[in-house]
Every structure is written in structure tokens, then in C-alpha cells.
Amino acid sequence: YSGELWNYRRLCELNAVFYHNNTALLYLFPVDCFKAFRQVYILTYMFDAQVQRYYYNFYGAKFEYIGVAGDNVSNYHFVPELTVSDNEQFAKHITIEDGVTLNAIGEKPFSLSVSWYDKNIKTYSTGIKNNIYNFFHNKSKTPSNKNLWTVFKQYKSAIQGKGYAKSFLSCNARATNAYSDRTAVAYMCNIFFNPILKNFFEQKGVRIEEDKWALSELLQFLFRSGIRKGEDIRLYIPSLRMRNLLKRWMVGMYDDKIDPENQEQIPIENKLEKAKALIDKYNLNDTSSDA
């Protein structure tokens, strides 16, 4: 057989296609590719929140968390205990735009999500463009070559504007250092996990951490900017949901350490006390003003 369904046949033979709820065909990378190795090491951050953890849980793959110790490339090494990152060292480099006017568009839980843009892009495109321009021109006061912005790619043309049009980077960009000189960032997304994929995994008993997944995606994008080199950045993130996820991360309210056996979060001692101190130190309370 060599017809138009040939590719589907090939994937089915690899046991890589699933028919979900009589509505969708889902492709999952063949797990046998991982089983072919005696050991596989994955260097990543917030693994518990990522699709690949859901994938391994789905297939019943066994994994364990280990850490990395050392302070430079000459002495990095694996250690038995997971290394908990010190988010404070990054928090001190992030200034979040908390002005009421600029952030009003993102107050509702689903504002600036894909479904929200689908329904509202014609109504709000001019206002969003004005907000982004206002942020770069009047708040961060940065030249265009220091700006970085993102939105879901299908809406890029509708809201790109003067002074930042050429500074776009896809919100799911990975493995690029080309924007590590950017110090002003406009993040115009409110990210939610694909509902079909979420339902597929949950029906199979896989735990989905949607907020942590959204935070992981946000952090991946932010670390394309100058913060990856320890530079200060100014951030416009009008979605209240995404902004609060980031603020909680900044004060250590999320960590990546879980027990793979029962998948329960392992508490960190004194986390709340430390968080309160950092909230005061960095003025991270969500008391917005136009100042």
C-alpha cells in the first residue's frame, strides 16, 4: 500500500498512534526508542511539569530524579539529590510591569488565551498594540534591538506594531541564544495545556500539572532574554494568571522535587516563611498601580 494513508499505517505499525474518544488521532513518539538504551539522562528544568513526564507516566517508564552540582563546566557532576534552584538569584533581575491600565486586559482567568484571541482579536488588536508600544516606549524606554515580544503565532500579524515588529520570537521557542541581549520583554500569552491531550492523559491516570506546565513554558521563553546572562530585564505580562504564576516561582513557591513513587510534592522546610520575606523584599504583592 502506498496511498495517502501510508504515513498513518507506518505510525500504527510503530504503535505510535492513538484514537482518542472517537474524535482525534494522537501521535506519541515510539517509547521503544528509549527502551533500546540501558540508561537515558535528561538534563532539564521543572521535569514534573513537562509533557515528557506525562509521556513516561503513560508508558509506565521508571525514572528517578538526580541533581547537578558544581559551579562551572569544568566541575559539573551528577549528585544523588535533586538540586533545588535558588529562584531568588533570578528574581532580583526581574522587574514586572504592574500598572493597572496596561494590565487591565488580562484580569480574567482566560484572558489572552488562544480561545480568547479567537473571539476578541478584532476588538482588542489596536488596544494590545498600543499597550505593547507604551510599554517599550514609555516604561522600559528601550531601543527596538533590546526588545523581545511574543504572542501565539497566528495572531502575530494582528498585533505587531511600530518599534517592536522585528523583535518577535515564538512563545514556544527553544535552544536559541540569539536574543540573550534583550532586556525588555512583552509576553502576551495565557497558556493552557491542549484540552484533547490533557483528557487523553488523565483518562489513562496520568497527573497533569497545568499551572506548572504553563509556568515552565513561560520560564523557557524568559530565559531566551538577557536574564540567562544575569542581566536585569523588565517584563510586561498582562495575563494576571501568568503574572501570578511567575511571582510565586520568584519567591520559591514552586519546586521540581517530587516522589516518583506516589507523585506527591515533597515540602521544603520554611518555604512559606522564606516566600513571605521575599515578597516583602522584592515588593511582589499584586497591588497594581499606574505609577
Regions found by a protein language model. Name each.
Residues 1-169:
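Positively charged, amphipathic N-terminal segments that serve as targeting/anchoring signals
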Residues 56-65, 235-267:
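C-terminal/domain-terminus segments
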Residues 65-69, 193-195, 209-213, 260-263:
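Glycine-rich loops and low-complexity Gly/Arg-rich segments
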Residues 69-76, 174-178, 193, 243, ...:
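A short acidic, often aromatic-flanked loop/helix-cap motif at beta-alpha or helix-coil junctions
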Residues 128, 214-217, 271:
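Alpha-helical structural motif
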Residues 138-139, 252, 256, 278-285:
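Surface-exposed polar/charged interaction patches
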Residues 163-245, 252:
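Conserved RecA-like P-loop NTPase helicase motor core
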Residues 265-291:
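BZIP DNA-binding basic region
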